[in-house]
């Protein structure tokens, strides 16, 4: 029995990067032998075990065969006679198909096992598929795109790009389950340059299948005086990259991605203006979130940003009453943390424009000041003072907030 570290751990070590993931393959062992060494079985489809001390995952070397379309259509074979190379050949990219032996004390020993040229592709900065089995799992298209967001200087090898396009044309992407699509998109959004993920998906045709709402934004013009980059799709990519550069959360990055969906449905005769695109964005965003089963915290923030980002940009022109109405519509008084994220997304929107990446965004500070003032109003005391007139409470609280905001930010009420 031999144990090997495989995949990302070897790749990242060769690149001089911190090792994020540690995956292990065990060659020449049976499930019974693993259990005898106190490894705990956890795999459903094939034998995966947790180490008794570190709780890291160890999988028996296996081969796999495609039996049906989509992500789940595989049959696995595992036995002591499955070799390391047979296990590595089923992996997606050459840079992920390398291994090193692990000694009994956990140290990596011996040379890098690299049967498919992964080290050469690392040096060439190429994503290249290992073999013909790549076409058997459509998730690999999403994984390549996600790796492009992490390793932004890497390119997809021409033969791999052609294979990905063929898979999309064959309908393989259409068989993906929504949860897995969201999982890969979310991970890609959290990488250093998420725009690269969408570029790779667009180049192979997958973006039009899994996120047609985003694909439709490319080529849609905007007013050049507001958006020097002109193309709406380019703008959205700049926005998500700015959000990534700032280290913003996944909900903020998803809101940044989806804030302008409605611009794709602007009537051609009014372009490049996009009057009312905020409402159309909301109408497109709701079914998108339902289709991909987007988590509530991502969906709810994205809806606020899609609906209100135009108003957030215009707050320097607003009086106190309009500011308070905006805070109330965005539910900022009850959910200040979410509103803070909405400000991050709107700031990314403002700075995700060609040549305006560092432009000041005083709107955020004004809204923060307004929210502090509005939340300081003692609604309970006002309600107590109007105990016999409950119909007047809501309006009285609103007027008190308007006065507080007017004083705090120095604008007329």
UniProtKB/Swiss-Prot annotation:
A single active site specifically recognizes both ATP and CTP and is responsible for their addition. GO terms for molecular function: ATP binding; CCA tRNA nucleotidyltransferase activity; cyclic-nucleotide phosphodiesterase activity; magnesium ion binding; phosphatase activity; tRNA binding. This is Multifunctional CCA protein. InterPro entries: CCA_bact, HD_domain, NT_sf, PolA_pol_head_dom, PolyA_RNA-bd, tRNA_CCA-adding_enzyme. Its EC number is 2.7.7.72, 3.1.3.-, 3.1.4.-. The lineage of its organism: Bacteria, Pseudomonadati, Pseudomonadota, Betaproteobacteria, Burkholderiales. Disulfide bonds: none annotated. Gene3D superfamilies: Beta Polymerase, domain 2, cca-adding enzyme, domain 2. Catalyzes the addition and repair of the essential 3'-terminal CCA sequence in tRNAs without using a nucleic acid template. Adds these three nucleotides in the order of C, C, and A to the tRNA nucleotide-73, using CTP and ATP as substrates and producing inorganic pyrophosphate. tRNA 3'-terminal CCA addition is required both for tRNA processing and repair. Also involved in tRNA surveillance by mediating tandem CCA addition to generate a CCACCA at the 3' terminus of unstable tRNAs. While stable tRNAs receive only 3'-terminal CCA, unstable tRNAs are marked with CCACCA and rapidly degraded. Magnesium is required for nucleotidyltransferase activity. Nickel for phosphatase activity. Keywords: ATP-binding, Hydrolase, Magnesium, Metal-binding, Multifunctional enzyme, Nickel, Nucleotide-binding, Nucleotidyltransferase, RNA repair, RNA-binding, Transferase, tRNA processing.
